[in-house]
Amino acid sequence: MSILEKITSSPSECAEHLTNKDSCLSKKIQKELTSFLQKKETLGCDSESCVITHPAVKAYAQQKGLDLSKELETRFKAPGPRNNTGLLTNFNIDETLQRWAIKYTKFFNCPFSMMDFERVHYKFNQVDMVKVYKGEELQYVEGKVVKRPCNTFGCVLNTDFSTGTGKHWVAIFVDMRGDCWSIEYFNSAGNAPPGPVIRWMERVKQQLLKIHHTVKTLAVTNIRHQRSQTECGPYSLFYIRARLDNVSYAHFISARITDEDMYKFRTHLFRIA
C-alpha cells in the first residue's frame, strides 16, 4: 500500500471539508460565473481556481459585488508549488494548516515558528497546551479567531533563526487522544531536536501532566527519509496530516518514506492555480 493511501487527502483542489467535490464553488458563485466556467479553456484555464483568479473574472466579480477571495480561502486548498519542487513558504504551510483545522474540528493549527522562539515573539512559545485542550486558547479558523477544545496540536518550525531566510522545516505534533498522550518532534532529515525544542517539549509535558496521568515526549528522528534539498516542507505537513488521520508515529520509525511520495503529496496539498 502506498503511504498516501493511509491518509484521507486527495488531489482534488477543493477544500477537504466540502462533501460535494463536483465543484469547489458555492452554488451562488457557480450561477454567477456560469458563462466563464463553461468557456474556461478560452481563458487559458483548466481549473475553477484558475477561472476565479483570472483578471477578467476578478473584474467582473468586483462589478457584481462577488467575494471571490472568500471562496478561495474557504472552499479551495491553499496556493502553493503543486506541480514543481519549489520550496514551501510559511504562508503555504500556515494556510494549509488553517484549512485542515476546518476539516478536523479538534485540531489546533499553530502558526509557523523560527527556532529562536524562546526570545522572539511567536505564538508557538506562548501556547498553553492545557488551554488548547480545554478550548481556552485562541486559534484562527475559517477567517475568524475562535476558541474550541482541541485534542491535537500541530506546528511547523524552521531550524533557522528569525534573522535568516530559512533552512529546514520540521514538525511538532501533540496528541491528546487516547490513554497515553504524546508530544512529538519529526525531522525528515533524521536529526535530533535542538535545545529549544527539547525545552519546549518538556515544558508542555509538565503542563499536560497536571490534567492527564501519562504524557511522553518522542523524537521521531531515527530514519533519514529525505534525500532531496526541497521536500522538508511537504514531509513536515505530511507527518501532521498522517497523525491527524491516526497513522501511528511508529510508521515513521519503521520504514522510509520517499521523496517521490512527497512529490505526489504536493498535489494533495495545493490547489491548481
From Swiss-Prot:
Keyword Hydrolase set for record: yes
Residues annotated for substrate binding in this entry: Q226
Inducing stimuli: Expressed late after infection.
Family annotation (Pfam families): Peptidase_C48 (PF02902)
Active site annotation, chain numbering: H168, N187, C232 (nucleophile)
GO MF terms held by the record: cysteine-type endopeptidase activity
EC number: 3.4.22.-
Any one GO biological process: symbiont-mediated suppression of host innate immune response
Main location as per UniProt: host cell
UniProt keyword annotations, A-Z: Host cytoplasm, Host-virus interaction, Hydrolase, Inhibition of host innate immune response by virus, Late protein, Protease, Thiol protease, Viral immunoevasion, Virion
Subcellular location: Host cytoplasm; Virion
Any one GO cellular component localisation term in the record: virion component
Family the UniProt entry places it in: Belongs to the peptidase C63 family.
Function: Cysteine protease that plays several role during infection including processing of the structural polyprotein or inhibition of the host immune response. Catalyzes the maturation of the pp220 and pp62 polyprotein precursors into core-shell proteins. Plays a role in the disruption of host pyroptosis via specific cleavage of gasdermin D/GSDMD. In addition, strongly decreases the host cGAS-STING signaling by targeting IKBKE via its enzymatic activity. Also impairs host FOXJ1-mediated antiviral effect via degradation of FOXJ1.
Name assigned to this protein: SUMO-1 cysteine protease S273R
Organism whose genome encodes this protein: African swine fever virus (isolate Tick/South Africa/Pretoriuskop Pr4/1996) (ASFV)
